[in-house]
Curated annotation (Swiss-Prot):
SNARE required for protein transport between the ER and the Golgi complex. GO terms for molecular function: SNAP receptor activity; SNARE binding. It comes from Debaryomyces hansenii (strain ATCC 36239 / CBS 767 / BCRC 21394 / JCM 1990 / NBRC 0083 / IGC 2968). Pfam families: V-SNARE_C (PF12352). PANTHER family: GOLGI SNAP RECEPTOR COMPLEX MEMBER 2 (PTHR21230:SF1), VESICLE TRANSPORT V-SNARE PROTEIN VTI1-RELATED (PTHR21230). Residues 89-135 are annotated as: Disordered. The chain crosses the membrane at residues 208-228. Residues 229 are vesicular. The keyword Lyase does not apply. One of its GO terms (cellular component) is late endosome membrane. This is Protein transport protein BOS1.
C-alpha cells in the first residue's frame, strides 16, 4: 500500500506542475499540455480506485485509519485538480476569443488607414465602403469564432475518448477478476481441465475481439482529430 501511495504522491506532483504551467501560459499553451493533464488525471483516478480497494481489504489492519485519511486526501486532491483544470480551460477559451476580437479590430483600423490615409482630399470612407468593410470584418470574426468552437469541440472529443478508454480498461480488469473467480468455482465443482481449457480458449478469442474493437476505436478518434485539425 505504501508503494501505491508513493506513486499517487508522484502523480499529484506531476499534475500540480502541469496545471501551473497551463495557468502561466493560458493563451499560448499547446493542446498537448491539456491532453497530458487529462491523461494524468485519468491515471490518478485509477490509482485512487486501486488504493481504495486495498483499504477496503485491510479494514482490520491497525494502520487502516492512516490509509483512509490518505485516501480522503487523494479524493480531495482529485476534486481540486479537476475543478481547477475546468476553470483554466474556460479562462483560456475566453482569452482566445478576446484576443481574436482585438486582432480583428486592429486589422480593421489598419486597413482603413491604408485605404484613406494616403489621400489628403479624401474625407473618409463612404457608407457603402463602411458596410463592405464591416461585412468583411464580421466574416473574419465569425471564422475565428468557428475555429474557437471547433477547438472546444475537439477538447470535448478528447475528453470523451479518454473517458471511453478509462471505461474499457476498467471493464477489462473486471472481466479478468470474474474469469479468475469463475475458474476457481469450476475447479471447486469438479469440472474437468479440458472443459476449463475450452472456456479459456473461448475467453482468449473474446479478448482478441475486445482489443480489435479497442484499436478500431483509437483509429476512429485519430481520423476525427485529423479532420478537425
Amino acid at each position: 500500500m505504501n508503494s501505491l501511495y508513493n506513486h499517487g504522491i508522484k502523480q499529484t506532483q506531476l499534475i500540480t506542475k502541469d496545471l501551473s504551467s497551463f495557468e502561466k501560459s493560458l493563451s499560448t499553451s499547446p493542446l498537448s499540455l491539456q491532453g497530458s493533464i487529462t491523461t494524468s488525471l485519468t491515471a490518478f483516478k485509477k490509482t485512487i480506485r486501486e488504493y481504495n480497494d486495498l483499504v477496503a481489504q485491510n479494514k482490520k489492519d491497525e494502520s487502516n485509519a492512516k490509509h483512509e485519511a490518505r485516501l480522503a486526501k487523494f479524493n480531495q486532491d482529485l476534486q481540486d485538480f479537476t475543478s481547477k483544470f475546468d476553470s483554466l480551460k474556460k479562462q483560456r477559451d475566453q482569452a482566445l476569443q478576446e484576443t481574436n476580437k482585438q486582432e480583428l479590430l486592429g486589422r480593421r483600423h489598419t486597413t482603413q488607414r491604408q485605404q484613406y490615409g494616403e489621400n489628403p482630399y479624401d474625407t473618409g470612407p463612404t457608407q457603402q465602403q463602411q458596410q463592405q468593410q464591416m461585412s468583411y470584418q464580421e466574416g473574419l470574426y465569425k471564422e475565428k469564432t468557428s475555429l474557437a468552437r471547433g477547438t472546444q469541440q475537439l477538447d470535448h472529443i478528447l475528453d470523451m475518448g479518454q473517458q471511453a478508454f478509462e471505461d474499457i480498461v476498467e471493464q477489462n480488469e473486471t472481466l479478468r477478476r470474474l474469469q479468475s473467480k469463475f475458474e476457481d468455482g469450476l475447479v471447486t465443482l469438479g469440472v474437468s481441465q479440458g472443459t476449463i481449457r475450452t472456456i479459456e480458449k473461448r475467453a482468449k478469442q473474446d479478448k482478441w475481439l475486445f482489443w480489435a474493437a479497442f484499436v478500431f476505436t483509437l483509429v476512429c478518434f485519430w481520423y476525427i482529430l485529423k479532420i478537425f485539425r
